């Protein structure tokens, strides 16, 4: 939990520094802005971090000081985030190998699932209770149609977020998942409904993997 929080904080601060850097560049006079125009974030950070403002207190000099400071801060935070991500990657591989083996379960997804499971060990006693924990249990909707459901909004937001990330990743990179979603939509379901079905399927996979990992850790 602490590593994920630290990573999220570093990413948020990095984004803020990059946004501030972009804003400073936009505010530059045209002549000073021209060499920086069209650069991507990485190129912009590299260019601004290596600026040499020189002495003096002219507006251009002070602007370059600010740009260099923001760029170096963004670079430092990027390195911090990458370091924390590497720690999370190693930790989840060691603690949750079965969960990490699931398609779409990268370090942050596995960490969120592991944290949710660790905080709610009793919910791992059955697939149904875990699905409810993840907010992946279908709830009937009063729409006049017997086949209309929504997912429960109750449950652990970390686990729900992890399942959603896995679903989107699979839809982007896995042909079988794309075929599954297409088939569900051909049956009359909306894309949102199809994703709900997919999340329920993934919840079943995640339950089995987490149960194995938690048992290996002596937490089941």
Describe every region a protein language model picked out.
Residues 185-220:
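Basic, amphipathic alpha-helical segments enriched in Lys/Arg and hydrophobic/aromatic residues
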Residues 2-98:
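Glycine-rich, often acidic, oxyanion-interacting loops/wings at catalytic, nucleic-acid
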Residues 4, 67, 113, 162-167, ...:
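Short alpha-helical scaffolding segments that buttress acidic/His motifs in well-ordered protein cores
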């Amino acid at each position: 939990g602490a590593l994920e929080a630290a990573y999220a904080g570093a990413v948020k601060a990095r984004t803020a520094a990059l946004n501030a850097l972009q804003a400073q560049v936009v505010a530059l006079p045209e002549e000073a802005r021209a060499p920086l125009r069209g650069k991507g974030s990485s190129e912009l950070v590299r260019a601004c971090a290596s600026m040499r403002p020189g002495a003096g207190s002219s507006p251009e000099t002070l602007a370059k000081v600010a740009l260099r400071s923001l760029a170096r801060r963004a670079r430092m935070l990027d390195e911090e985030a990458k370091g924390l991500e590497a720690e999370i990657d190693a930790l989840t591989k060691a603690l949750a190998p079965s969960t990490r083996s699931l398609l779409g379960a990268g370090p942050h997804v596995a960490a969120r699932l592991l944290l949710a499971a660790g905080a709610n060990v009793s919910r791992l006693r059955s697939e149904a209770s875990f699905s409810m924990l993840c907010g992946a249990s279908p709830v009937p909707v009063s729409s006049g149609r017997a086949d209309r459901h929504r997912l429960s909004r109750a449950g652990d937001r970390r686990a729900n977020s992890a399942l959603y990330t896995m679903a989107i990743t699979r839809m982007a990179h896995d042909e079988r998942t794309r075929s599954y979603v297409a088939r569900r939509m051909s049956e009359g379901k909306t894309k949102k409904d199809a994703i709900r079905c997919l999340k329920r399927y993934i919840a079943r996979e995640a339950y089995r993997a987490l149960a194995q990992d938690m048992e290996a850790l002596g937490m089941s």
